Regions:
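Cation-handling catalytic/transport regions enriched in His/Asp/Glu
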Residues: 1-191
Length: 191
């Protein structure tokens, strides 16, 4: 598999990086260009942190009955700690409150696309835990390998794309492009 990715996928990812280099108008991409996709700036969410959560509620309500119930439970039980505040620890992750069989999401919304990534990626992890928490086989919910866990979170990122304008307005397609390029760049690294 690694040889196949090296032979076919790495050249594809290299072409994608070259197009990004040209779009940015730089001579070469360096490590500090890794998170930059557009010369005029990467897309940022159009709403407040509370509006981002409410857009997430709308998206998950329309996505499926199961995701609606999941997200409403997360909101109603206050299982998001995502608003920035003084002296709050950095980072973003999903964990569990196993005594209650519920997921919990911690992050620091800061007005970047990462805020929306919490609503898609971390909620992908959280939804997986939500649907499997009562499964008696611990490997199905608590002891996932990283590769397995990332299937749920990265898939949810793509499932969310039809609703991305809720978060980015007219910059929705810029976000889609940035997200796809980021996902493509991850394949050689993640393999």
């Amino acid at each position: 598999l690694r040889e196949q990715i090296k032979k076919t996928f790495v050249p594809f990812a290299s072409q994608m990086h070259e197009r990004r280099r040209e779009r940015l108008g730089v001579d070469s991409l360096t490590y500090y260009d890794a998170g930059v996709y557009f010369k005029q700036g990467d897309p940022a969410p159009t709403g407040t942190p509370q509006e981002i959560l409410e857009s997430g509620r709308k998206m998950y309500s329309e996505m499926s009955e199961e995701t609606r119930d999941f997200f409403n439970m997360m909101m109603d039980w206050e299982l998001f700690d995502v608003f920035g505040r003084k002296n709050k620890a950095t980072g973003g992750y999903m964990t569990e409150i196993s005594d209650y069989g519920v997921p919990f999401i911690f992050a620091n919304f800061n007005g970047t696309s990462g805020d929306v990534d919490v609503i898609t990626h971390e909620c992908g992890h959280a939804f997986q835990y939500y649907v499997s928490a009562k499964d008696p086989i611990p490997e199905h919910n608590r002891y996932l390998t990283m590769e397995t866990a990332e299937i749920h979170s990265m898939s949810m990122e793509f499932f969310a794309e039809p609703w991305i304008e809720l978060f980015f307005g007219e910059k929705g397609n810029d976000y889609r492009q940035m997200h796809l390029e980021d996902a493509i760049a991850f394949v050689p690294y993640g393999t």
